[in-house]
Curated annotation (Swiss-Prot):
This is Polynucleotide 5'-hydroxyl-kinase grc3. One of its GO terms (biological process) is cleavage in ITS2 between 5.8S rRNA and LSU-rRNA of tricistronic rRNA transcript (SSU-rRNA, 5.8S rRNA, LSU-rRNA). The keyword Transferase applies. It comes from Aspergillus terreus (strain NIH 2624 / FGSC A1156). It is found in: Nucleus, Nucleolus. The gene is grc3.
Length: 815
């Protein structure tokens, strides 16, 4: 059982058992006589009271529980009785005002049978907090501790008659004075009419172009700041846009309550001449208390050291080759995005020596949270225009006018730690593609985003990349070390004769979505986004995956469309391939050569395989193997043929591709590339067909086949697509609620709504909800009050030990 201790900067973290034993000894020594009422001095030496996550039942009287409930909570009550005298006084002395109880659990809860639950939220519900973390995703964060929503200042500009140029129900044009700013939540288009503004690192000048901005509450809000202008002010038009991304709230509660809520005071001022119920897709916020949904909103401000570093790096122009690394949650992605936008839109007044016409190359080596691709991929992208929004607003660049993905490789996991050899080979191949890109765009700088895998084996990979990729700069996003990371990076940078810049981290104070939830949001956005040929911006469709028309691909017979099905990781029996494939996410990989599988190395491992040499006897006993800088990046064995590795499953005749001993050897990055992801909706054994749902354009697959490439489906270790299983249920609930609203509105306005037809429609919609709730691998809990009470009791009875990510770190996590 864990206990929670206060986070102390000076003391090193201790185990829960040691902390408990120390407290027991102190209690025995301090209380030889019967316990007396403790004084104020004594309370300071005792463990702090638990700041538990609030629940609707927290303030309700305790209810009698059944024997079954007592069995589940017996362990908690026994642990709680032990320090009863210790707990009473701290709970009286330390008073915290609880946050507003979340009221998102309205009708039911849907989740996987494994115990992962997804809360059911009403779309128009104005109260409550953001979507809570699932049981599998719960963690201690600063978001758990604040009691009230702080009145945090957002905008430095107050709208009035003098700075409002014009406004209507769709558009707002304002003047922003120099060094003042405006914060807007929602999604909108920005048109700079006069002056120069800064937005997420980009400096935008007057032009006829509109820039699409996505500013949800899941991330810090972009700040529109006037840099210079005519008569000391810039004139900016902000216009509502209808991309359809808000429709995803009907498919997942993770997309609910992330855009603008009711009209703010600034909105009401600018909508005086509009219809009474007019609403834009954005809202102007002066402070965080202006938000009707009472969320913890913060502006996206940069540290001065960040701004100086971005300006210094931008001055290198086309010679820039920067690797950005650091611990998890230190702001690597934010810094990369700001640097990218700054390079794509330099200010001519301050940087006359550099004019970017060749774009910027973005090498994303983070398969867990990629910027322009779905999870599980690393890629090289060529950007030509700044981007304004979180990753789930641009999960793919396919068909985009702002940039293209030059080449991508499927890692098949959110972390490269399971197969670092393949990861390094893929990164090296992408770097070779960048060098080839320089032939067409010689002044194209490069930004490399490295994942938070910076300790242990990840540090070895990072130092190898620093020595091998021909970089110009290395940026480490933490001033607090640790030394065992910074020193090897500094030595590698010194060996490569490049500077190592250390910047302060900029972690998020409040977290409304966990990393797993953000990955689900990005994956869901990826599968629902489309780019029509005649539209310059993406659109999102709210049709559930179960109602999307799939691609039907033959996996056997004369019209076989795929060469094989590969399962990364440990070998499985061919009889289990059907179960492993059905309902999973797979990478669609184009194989450029029949011999595209890396051969099996007799001495596996990172230091012995691709990146290092054979260790000496003295090195074999050490934990950290020494890497050989001169080792050439080549496979350790000849490539194997795909056809020779095919084994047909006995019942379904599926082409199981496996080469290796114990674990499957991956595809060679130099002879293959990833086209995207697909969801295997079903396996039609009778027709020997796979039903695939994928956003990959049919023209890309057709072009790959016309070039003689084979298609291989790679089943990796990506997160289960739980969001796809529950989409139909949430869509059915949203449709039923819209119908209920329509009926209520008709009755209120005394309009004949056709009672018989309404009742019939309502019955059909309720039946749709009933059928959608019977999806396999999903359980709908209609009454979850008991579950909430049990969870609240568990939270109150637990003391969690909060550990630092590393010595001197302000963030928390596994160390």
């Amino acid at each position: 059982m864990k206990r929670k201790a206060e986070k102390q900067q000076s003391a090193a973290p201790v185990s829960a058992f040691a902390a408990r034993k120390a407290r027991q000894q102190a209690q025995i020594a301090a209380t030889p006589e019967p316990v007396k009422p403790p004084s104020a001095v004594e309370t300071t030496e005792e463990p702090p009271s638990k700041k538990a996550r609030t629940s609707p039942e927290e303030d309700t009287p305790s209810q009698s529980v059944s024997p079954a409930d007592r069995v589940q909570t017996r362990r908690s009550s026994r642990r709680k009785a032990e320090p009863s005298e210790i707990e009473k006084t701290p709970r009286r002395k330390t008073k915290t005002t609880p946050a507003t109880p979340p009221e998102h659990l309205t009708d039911g809860t849907v989740g996987r049978e494994s115990g992962i639950q997804t809360p059911v939220e009403e779309v128009s519900e104005p109260e409550g907090n953001d979507v809570p973390l699932d049981d599998a995703d719960r963690y201690e964060s600063p978001a758990d501790t604040p009691a009230l929503v702080e009145a945090f200042p957002l905008s430095k500009t107050r709208l009035n008659k003098s700075n409002i140029v014009y406004s209507d129900e769709h558009t707002l044009c304002v003047r922003i004075k120099e060094k003042l700013s405006l914060v807007v939540i929602g999604h909108y288009d920005v048109w700079v009419k006069r002056g120069v503004i800064s937005l997420m690192g980009a400096k935008l000048h007057p032009s006829p172009r509109l820039y699409r901005v996505y500013a949800p509450s899941t991330h810090s809000l972009p700040v529109i700041k006037c840099v210079s202008g005519v008569d000391g002010a810039a004139e900016v038009e902000i216009k509502s846009c209808h991309s359809g991304i808000y429709r995803l709230r009907d498919l997942s509660p993770l997309y609910q309550r992330i855009w603008n809520g009711s009209n703010t005071s600034a909105d009401k001022l600018t909508l005086k001449n509009a219809e009474p119920h007019a609403r834009r897709t954005f809202s102007v916020l002066y402070t965080s208390t202006d938000d009707s949904l009472k969320r913890h909103l913060r502006p996206l401000h940069l540290e001065k050291q960040w701004s100086s570093a971005i300006k210094s790096l931008s001055q290198k122009g086309g010679k820039l080759r920067a690797l950005i690394c650091g611990p998890k949650g230190s702001g690597k992605s934010t810094f990369s995005r700001y640097l990218l936008n700054h390079l794509l839109s330099p200010a001519p007044q301050t940087e006359p020596s550099y004019c970017n016409t060749d774009g910027v190359a973005f090498l994303d080596l983070d398969p867990g949270q990629p910027e322009f691709a779905p999870m599980g991929q690393i890629y090289l992208a060529h950007l030509r225009s700044p981007v304004f929004g979180p990753p789930f607003s641009h999960p793919s660049l396919e068909g985009s006018q702002d940039g293209t993905v030059i080449r991508a490789h499927h890692i098949g996991a959110s972390s490269p730690k399971d197969d670092p050899d393949h990861y390094v080979l893929a990164a090296t191949d992408l770097m070779d593609r960048y060098r080839a890109l320089l032939a067409s765009y010689p002044q194209c700088p490069l930004i490399i985003n490295y994942p938070g895998w910076i300790f242990g084996l990840g540090l070895e990979v990072a130092t190898w990349l620093v020595r091998s990729l021909g970089l110009s700069d290395v940026i480490y996003m933490s001033e607090k070390g640790p030394a065992e990371v910074v020193e090897p990076l500094g030595q590698a940078a010194a060996a490569a004769r490049i500077p190592l810049t250390t910047l302060p981290s900029q972690p998020t104070d409040f977290v409304s979505r966990s990393s797993a939830q953000l990955r689900s949001m990005q994956m869901q956005s990826y599968f629902h986004m489309t780019r029509p040929a005649d539209v310059s911006t993406p659109l999102w469709l709210d049709q559930p995956m179960s109602r999307t028309r799939p691609f039907k691909v033959h996996y056997a017979g004369p019209h076989q469309g795929i060469r094989g099905i590969m399962v990364m990781g440990s070998q499985i029996h061919p009889d289990l391939l059907h179960e492993a494939l059905d309902g999973s996410l797979v990478g669609v990989v184009a194989v450029e050569s029949p011999n595209a599988i890396l051969g099996h190395s007799e001495v596996p491992g990172l230091a012995n395989g691709v990146m290092g040499k054979q260790p000496s006897p003295a090195e074999e006993g050490s934990e950290d193997a020494v890497m050989d800088e001169a080792t050439e990046m080549v496979p350790t064995a000849p490539l194997a043929s795909i056809d020779s590795g095919i084994t047909r499953s006995p019942h379904e005749d599926l082409p199981y591709l496996f080469v290796g001993a114990g674990s499957c050897n991956p595809l060679d990055p130099k002879a293959s590339h990833c086209l995207g992801l697909a969801l295997v909706r079903s396996v039609n054994v009778a027709a020997r067909q796979l039903e695939l749902v994928t956003p990959i354009a049919a023209s890309r697959i057709r072009d790959a086949l016309q070039q003689g490439y084979g298609i291989v489906l790679v089943r990796g270790q990506l997160d289960n697509p739980n969001w796809a299983l529950s989409e139909e249920y949430y869509a059915a609930r949203a449709a039923e609620k819209r119908h209920r609203r329509f009926v209520d509105s008709s009755r209120k306005d005394k309009v004949d709504d056709g009672t018989d037809d309404s009742a019939h429609t309502s019955a059909i919609l309720k039946d749709r909800i009933r059928r959608a709730s019977h999806v396999p691998w999903m359980t709908v809990i209609e009454d979850n009050s008991r579950r909430q009470r049990e969870a609240a009791q568990r939270e109150k009875s637990l003391w969690k030990l909060r550990k630092k990510a590393y010595p001197g770190s302000e963030s928390e996590g596994d160390w």
